[in-house]
């Protein structure tokens, strides 16, 4: 489990409030879950082995990252992928994500 600095928490929260979605990265390189902010910016929404929402505060974001996403080595900005039917890291460096046409969600391409 990664411990996040105050500066990292502030940066992630600022990006979330700008509309950037994050996903967790496990040690095997797989992207998991998603973290975003509600349209009113009052809540941080998350999905990872369940889903819920927390108040949009630094303390609640830290709890979320270090408790719910504790199996992740980091979190990174993500984008929706129709190909994967889910959020995947924008940075394609993570080896655990299959970008090939053999992915099970690719039909008839």
Predicted segments, located by residue:
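Acidic, low-complexity, intrinsically disordered interaction modules
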Residues: 22, 26-107
